[in-house]
Amino acid sequence: MASNNLLVDLKRCFSAPSLRSYLAEFISTFLFVFTAVGSAISARMLTTPDVTSSAGPLVATAVAQAFGLFAAVLIAADVSGGHVNPAVTFAYAIGGRIGVPSAMFYWASQLLGATFACLSLNLFSAGEEVPTTRIAVAMTGFGGAVLEGVLTFLLVYTVHVVGEREPRSRGGDGKREFAATALGALAVGLTQGAFVLAAGALTGASMNPARSFGPAVVSGHFKNQAVYWAGPMVGAAVAALVYQIMACPSVTGNVEAVVV
């Protein structure tokens, strides 16, 4: 019986809607990582050596990531759910909202999108090296992983609260649904930008394994990659479990969940 279920799941992974979902995740992750890494390159190119301690580049990167993630989630929301992040997909898999086989294809699409985005930037960045996410000199790997975990927990919990909806909505007022989706995507993007401002100088505030993986592949620098996988994945898992407890009436009593 288990083997039959696995075969059914695998068959669904190659259906037309599933293939469109993978493409949507590839494109949306490409968009976000291209924006995030590209803004970091541009900020570095426009910063002179005597003002490297200025907050300007960090603010510019935070704003770019906020709007980049907003756009990425919005364009993929009705096709794939707009995960744009392996940690979000992992949380949905833990919550039973996506099958493990499909989640693996989502991860592959996201990692490929991030890698191709960085390859594109490497071609057109006028000799500038693709920057990788790094932890501060005074911070340990464990401390960095914990911080990334906390940030990702908050981000993924936000995703669950404002963006809990099925791809290809089941009828209703299209304009109102789009407005609700856009508002949810904006909330996620603003959360990303706020956390970049809060912790960008400490760990880069990645909160997204694909965001760190793409630059590492292109640059060849994989130092502290474990920080950007272990922390976000654990944080995402905890967020999924906490959200289930908060939103499940059988656990919390008569709680009326507002679902976008």
From Swiss-Prot:
A Gene Ontology biological process term: water transport
InterPro entries: Aquaporin-like, Aquaporin_transptr, MIP, MIP_CS
Major place of residence: membrane
Sequence motif: NPA 1, positions: 85-87
Matching PROSITE patterns: MIP
One GO CC annotation: membrane
A Pfam family reported for this protein in Swiss-Prot or TrEMBL: MIP
Residues spanned by motif NPA 2: 208-210
This protein's UniProt keywords: Membrane, Repeat, Transmembrane, Transmembrane helix, Transport, Vacuole
Topology of this chain in the membrane: Multi-pass membrane protein
Residue intervals passing through the bilayer: 23-43, 57-77, 98-118, 135-155, 182-202, 226-246
Cellular location(s): Vacuole membrane
GO molecular function, one term: water channel activity
This protein's domain notes: Aquaporins contain two tandem repeats each containing three membrane-spanning domains and a pore-forming loop with the signature motif Asn-Pro-Ala (NPA).
Family under the similarity heading: Belongs to the MIP/aquaporin (TC 1.A.8) family. TIP (TC 1.A.8.10) subfamily.
Function, in words: Aquaporins facilitate the transport of water and small neutral solutes across cell membranes.
Record's protein name: Aquaporin TIP5-1
Encoding gene, per UniProt annotation: TIP5-1
